[in-house]
Each structure stands twice: as C-alpha cells, then as structure tokens.
Curated annotation (Swiss-Prot):
Residues bound to Mn(2+): 211, 230, 267
Native species: Mannheimia succiniciproducens (strain KCTC 0769BP / MBEL55E)
UniProt-recorded name of the protein: Phosphoenolpyruvate carboxykinase (ATP)
UniProt-listed HAMAP family: PEPCK_ATP
Residues the record lists as binding ATP: 211, 230, 246-254, 295, 331, 447-448, 453
Cofactor: Mn(2+)
Record InterPro entries: PEP_carboxykinase_ATP, PEP_carboxykinase_C, PEP_carboxykinase_N, PEPCK_ATP_CS
SUPFAM superfamilies, alphabetized: PEP carboxykinase N-terminal domain (SSF68923), PEP carboxykinase-like (SSF53795)
BP GO annotations: gluconeogenesis
Length: 538
C-alpha cells in the first residue's frame, strides 16, 4: 500500500495527526543515509563501523523491560491470556481500557506533527497465518531494525496491505501518571489484542518490537492448533528438519548454524500441517566476545545493512566485541540472507523429526544427552530448565537455576500447557523424537566441550544415537547412550566425571528437589498430576 493519502488517514485513525512527511518502507540505502546524517543527536545517531554496519545505542534499556509489560484485560483476553497471579508470577500484567486510552494518547501525541518512518512487513513465513505488521516510529534506525527482523514484502504484497497489528513506537515519551494508574514505572510496553496495537514508551530497545510480535504469534497460533516456539531450526540434505529449544546462552544459534545443514531461522518458529516455518526475516545475534574464528557466519554477517546495538566502537571505527561495559547483551540484527547456508526462497521446511532441548546445567548433574519418552518430553518442556554460574562475594561460584516454561516463559501469552499439548500433538503426527542435551558443566568442573556437543548433535541428527546401546541414569530415569561416534565416552554418564559417585548423587538429589518444587505450579490439573511421574524422584 503506497497511497500516502490513505496511509495518512489510517495514521489519523490511530490519533496521529499533522504528520510532516511519511517515509514509507525505506530502502536500505535510504535508511543508511537517514540514521547517519549530520545533526542527529543522542540515541538517534548511528555510527558507521569499519565492517560497514551501523552501530547505535539504546540508552538505559539494553534489554527488554518485562516489569513494564501489560496486556489490556477485556472480554477477548480475560479467559485466554495466562495472567500473572500471586501463586505463579509472569510478565502478563492486566491493564484497564482507560489506562490504555491514556497511553495511546501519549504515544499518538509524541508521533504527531513529526516526520515518520512507516514500515509494513510480515511476521510469519506462511501466508495463511502470518501477521501483517505496521511499525510507526520517528527514529530511522528503529525502522532499519524492523526491516531487518520482519519478513520484507514484495511490491505486489504491499498493494492493498492491511495491517493486523500496528506497533506505535514512542520511545521518546514517558508516562507521567504511572503511579496513579498503578503501573511499574513511567516506561511501558503495552498490548491491546482486540485493537491489534502495541504501544512502546520510554524504552529505545529494538527487541521490544521483535519480541512483542512474537508474544502475539504466541497468542494467535496455538488457539488455531499451530505450535508457536522459541527455538532455532535447520534442515538436512534429505529434508529432515530439527528444532532446538533453549534459553539465552544455551547454544540455539551456535548449534543450529551448521555447515552441513541449511538454517531455517535462529529464534522464533511455528509448526503447522505443512511443517516448520520461521516468523522472521532476520537474525538477532549476541555479539559479546564475538570472533571471526569462533563464529565465522555471524561475524561475516556484520556488514553494510547490519545494525549493531550497544557495542563499543573505537575511534578508528573498529568494534571491540570483548567490551561489555555498556551491557553483556550486545547485539546485531541483520537480514537472514547475510548467512550463506539458508533455506530459500522462503524460510520453511517439513515437519520436525528431531526435537532438541538445550540446557546449560551449571550444577553438573544432567547427562550430555538423554533420549526422552513422550511424558518426559512434556515434563522437561514445561520445566524449561537451565542454570548459570554466578560469582558470590567470597569468590565461590554458585549455580543459579532458571525454570522458564517452554524455554520462553517471558513470551508466552497463553498457559504453558497449551504450548506443550500442541507441540506433543505435532511430534506424534511426524513421529519426532525428543532429546535433552546438556551444554553446561559436569563433575570435572569444566564446561562440556563444543566439540563433544557438536558430536552429540550429529549423532542425534544422523540417527546413530538410536542405534546406540543405552543405559539408565537413576533419580531422573534418563535413557543415556553408552557410546557415540566422535564423543568422549567418559562423559556420557555424568557419574563417571566425579571422583566419588556419591557426590553426583548428592547434587542430583538437590537438583531433583528443585525440579519437583518448580513443577508444583502445574499439579492443579489431572494432567499435571499425571506428569509428575515423568519427572525426577527427589
């Protein structure tokens, strides 16, 4: 839709008036010129780096702001959304229609009378279920970010484009009435599912737009029987699809970027009758400690049209990827075609036959790989476990566990069991097997090597794990292989990595207790009760 008169009317219907000029679906050339032009100040200013990519700063918010996330409570959402509660806290806090109206007025006022960038794009590679998304912003690099991250429409698709969801990004405005309205702060990321609008105020972080639309796909798709997943995905030469679930830092992007297989996508996917499809048209990779040696694909993708966030740019234009002084969450967004080995022309493939859950276990308890039963698949999917090592004041490094339902609780709009049901149903239809892979630590105190982890992934994907002789691990009742090609056999049973097996037993009992306690939130239903048997025995 390039009729600017009609577009101006549609902006008017959102309360955005007296627009000076609309820059509609700008080209990469124009975006580059706009975000680096002389006279830009503060967080609007982009800096050109020696790799050709533009670097920007997002201010005090260098990550999402989950405490400021709200969804309007109305007839449509009251019985569908997984609302936060005293018993089980989550990020889906209810907002009244009155408060919403006030915030929408604030953002509309901020965007009125300005020169605006409007980007029309798609979220979802399948025509039947994709969301047509319109992003309205006054900031050039935010238009660049969504051009990278969403699916870029053809000229034909832009004719008669009607948005299903509008993102009104008012990063420069804050809410003075937040206290009286009972909100968390002057900043806000709010959704009105009935109106099909997302409002952003006070935060410049690009990921709010990406993950905002992910949360909306997570609302609409499962209600239609389609799995909506926080995972990466790739496909082999024989058309065999694999999906990798995991929280941040567990290896989703690294392990799915594999020279032997084509990348479907690195973060958000759906699974319908036809198969697995990407929601996005780009990647959003972490860049802390990035090197050309360790991650050549991602490093090579950082060139003209890529957009770096919160990195340190030296005076000579080089980027110091080891410098996390602004944030450890330094990022780059780039169009997916910056990666060589991708599925073309549309990021989708057949139904998955291998489902891999990645956990980085800092407790040193979980085996490097276990094959899961259907009940265990549901249990460990709902648990969504990983653990980080955090230094304490006395220099002792203690593991801190994270349980995030479906490996992405922050983005779930419906109750976690709805995602588990749809995933298991899809797996049953395709005959998919599930595996739990620990990319974390063992009894040696060292992290399992990337070489061994890649060997394990290869064994899962080429089917050799299914031919391996299996043993059993007590407490968790995991089925574990005794040997795999190219993998150090001494690590496959975690008990063998301890000088004293009783030490593993003690740690395993502790971790099992944490799993059991976390799973109590699901035991309110008969199905949840039944799944307890698939979990560890503390």
């Amino acid at each position: 839709m390039t009729d600017l008169n009609q577009l101006t009317q549609e902006l008017g219907a959102l309360g955005i008036h007296d627009v000076q000029e609309v820059v509609y679906n700008p080209s990469y050339e124009l975006l580059f010129a706009e975000e680096t032009k002389p006279g830009l100040e503060g967080y609007e200013k982009g800096t050109v780096t020696n790799q050709g990519a533009v670097a920007v700063n997002t201010g005090i918010f260098t990550g999402r702001s989950p405490k400021d996330k709200y969804i309007v409570l109305d007839d449509k959402t009251k019985d569908t959304v997984w609302w936060t509660s005293e018993k089980v806290k989550n990020d889906n806090k209810p907002m009244s229609q009155d408060t919403w109206n006030s915030l929408k007025g604030l953002v509309a006022d901020q965007l009125s009378g300005k020169r605006l960038f409007v980007v029309d794009a798609f979220c979802g590679a399948n025509k039947d279920t994709r969301l047509a998304v319109r992003v309205v912003t006054e900031v050039a690099w935010q238009a660049h970010f969504v051009t990278n991250m969403f699916i870029r429409p053809s000229a034909e698709e832009l004719k008669g484009f009607k948005p299903d969801f509008v993102v009104m990004n008012g990063a420069k405005c804050t809410n003075p009435n937040w206290k009286e309205q009972g909100l968390n702060s002057e900043n806000f990321v709010a959704f009105n599912i009935t109106e099909g609008v997302q409002l952003i105020g006070g935060t410049w972080y690009g990921g709010e737009m990406k993950k905002g639309m992910f949360s909306m796909m997570n609302y609409f798709l499962p209600l239609r029987g389609i799995a909506s997943m926080h995972c990466s995905a790739n496909v082999g030469k024989d058309g065999d699809t694999a999906i990798f679930f995991g929280l941040s830092g567990t290896g989703k992007t690294t392990l799915s970027t594999d020279p032997k297989r084509q990348l479907i996508g690195d973060d958000e996917h759906g699974w319908d009758d036809e198969g697995v499809f990407n929601f996005e048209g780009g990647c959003y990779a972490k860049t802390i400690n990035l090197s050309a040696e360790n991650e050549p694909d991602i490093y090579g993708a950082i060139k003209r049209d890529a957009l770096l966030e919160n990195v340190v740019v030296l005076d000579n234009g080089d980027v110091d990827y080891a410098d996390g002084s602004k944030t450890e969450n330094t990022r780059v967004s780039y169009p997916i075609y910056h990666i060589q080995n991708i599925v073309k022309p549309v990021s989708k493939a057949g139904p998955a036959t291998k489902v891999i859950f990645l956990s980085a276990d800092a407790f040193g308890v979980l085996p490097p790989v276990s094959k899961l039963t259907p009940e265990q698949t549901k249990y460990y999917f709902l648990s969504g476990f990983t653990a980080k090592l955090a230094g304490t004041e006395r220099g002792i490094t203690e593991p801190t566990p994270t349980f995030s339902a479906c490996f992405g609780a922050a983005f779930l709009s419906l109750h976690p069991t709805q995602y588990a049901e749809v995933l298991v149903k899809r797996m049953q239809e395709s005959g998919a097997e599930a595996y739990l892979v620990n990319t974390g630590w063992n009894g040696t105190g060292k992290r399992i090597s990337i070489k061994d982890t890649r060997g394990i992934i290869d064994a899962i994907l080429d089917g050799s794990i299914d031919k391996a002789e299996m043993g059993s691990l007590p407490i968790f009742d995991f089925s574990i292989p005794k040997a795999l090609p190219g993998v150090n056999p001494a690590i496959l049973d975690p008990r063998d990595t301890y000088a004293d097996k009783a030490q593993w037993e003690e740690k395993a009992q502790d971790l099992a207790g944490r799993f059991v306690k976390n799973f109590e939130k699901y035991t309110g239903t008969a199905e949840g009760q039944a799944l307890v048997a698939a979990g560890p025995k503390a």
